[in-house]
A protein has these predicted regions:
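Acidic Gly/Asp/Thr-rich repetitive segments characteristic of extracellular carbohydrate-active
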Residues: 33-66, 70-72
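Bacterial N-terminal signal peptides
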Residues: 8-17
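Extracellular beta-strand/beta-solenoid scaffold signature
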Residues: 94-104, 121-130, 151-164, 179-193, ...
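Right-handed parallel beta-helix
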Residues: 86, 109-120, 135-149, 166-183, ...
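Short, T/G/N/S-enriched strand-turn elements that build extracellular solenoid repeat scaffolds
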Residues: 51-57, 70-78, 82, 101-105, ...
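Right-handed parallel beta-helix/beta-spiral solenoid domain characteristic of secreted/periplasmic
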Residues: 79-127, 142-151
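Boundary of Sec targeting at the N-terminus
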Residues: 24-26
């Protein structure tokens, strides 16, 4: 015998089900110059700012700029892709004394930034600050005009990676970091950090930054392992070092392949505990070409580099006992 369900019970059950059902999934959302942050961030009704769109998108989803405009600074705490298609210039002009993009996400979260132009306007602190997350990919981006503030270190950087622990992978490709008051791309762990890091910097230009072009500085580490490959890239016209690797207690390995380093005060500088492998590269027009203070000598040159026409070349300090295995 079948018992009918009273209508009141049916309506109550349906109401509870609807209340507990998840909101409509938004795996992809949109921003546009004509958008409104009260909109649902769909293609037909886009939002106005990146921050509202990032808040609206599902974890692991994508935020896409429909047209060229400035879309405001962002704080990211989940996996997300933020992209600007070819022909669209999605900009972020950061606020004075602040960062354009701050990332503090979960240990397995992947963050992808593609086709963005970040400008500090001579007053903002940093372009991208990565404090926590699983991976960071920066592709086809421009980071410029961020300001060094001597009372707030580190500032003035195009990209600042400062993880304290955990495992991090980063890839920076086809990107330019220029005219920043600090360093173009700076890896500098927070105090007491011991992260495990695997990074790639490829087809990158770090030019006319006040301090360094690319710096892998493990001075605050108490352990961990950092492996970074720099390939097919240019570090030029930087006020201090074109490329730096060293300091701290982490196991630090930096491979430099087919890089051009010119017009810097120092071309390439390495200090203990860095292991540096240099091949197929041109170091010229610097005040000092290479400066090696690793002990024991772990700055290896493979005989296929052109270290010439610097104020002081410095190549005699390199380890030419070639590693062949």
């Amino acid at each position: 015998m079948r018992t009918a369900i009273p209508l009141a019970v049916l309506f109550t059950t349906l109401a509870c089900s609807l209340a507990s059902a998840p909101a409509h999934a938004r795996a992809r959302v949109f921003v546009a110059s004509y958008g409104n942050d009260m909109n649902p961030c769909t293609f037909g009704s886009p939002c106005k700012t990146f921050q509202v769109a990032v808040n609206a998108v599902d974890a692991g989803g994508e935020v896409t700029a429909i047209d060229s405009a400035g879309f405001g600074p962002i704080s990211i705490n989940k996996a997300v892709t933020i992209t600007s298609p070819d022909g669209v210039e999605a900009g972020i002009v950061a606020n004075a004394g602040a960062d354009a993009i701050d990332i503090n996400a979960g240990s397995s979260d992947a963050i992808v930034l593609r086709g963005l132009t970040l400008d500090g306007a001579g007053t903002a602190h940093n372009g991208i600050v990565f404090s926590a997350g699983g991976s960071l990919t920066v592709t086809n981006c421009t980071l410029q005009n961020f300001a060094f503030d001597g009372s707030n270190l580190p500032t003035g950087n195009g990209i600042l990676m400062q993880p304290t622990a955990g495992t991090l992978a980063f890839t920076i490709t086809n990107t330019t970091a220029s005219n920043n008051g600090g360093t173009g791309i700076l890896f500098l762990t927070s105090s007491g950090g011991s992260p495990s890091v695997n990074g790639v910097i490829d087809h990158v230009v770090a030019d006319a930054n006040h301090f360094d072009g690319v710096s892998v500085d493990s001075r605050f580490t108490t352990g961990g392992a950092i492996v970074v490959t720099v390939s097919d890239s240019i570090a030029s016209n930087n006020g201090s070092q074109g490329i730096f690797a060293g300091n701290g207690s982490a196991t630090l390995k930096v491979s430099l392949d087919n890089v051009t380093v010119g017009g810097n005060f120092f071309g390439i500088v390495a200090s203990t505990p860095a292991n540096v492998l240099l091949g197929r590269s041109v170091i010229t027009g610097n005040g000092t070409g290479v400066q090696n203070s690793t002990s024991p000598n772990t700055f290896y040159s493979y005989g296929d580099n052109r270290i010439n026409l610097n104020g002081t070349d410095g190549y005699s300090s390199l380890n030419t006992t070639f590693i062949t295995h």
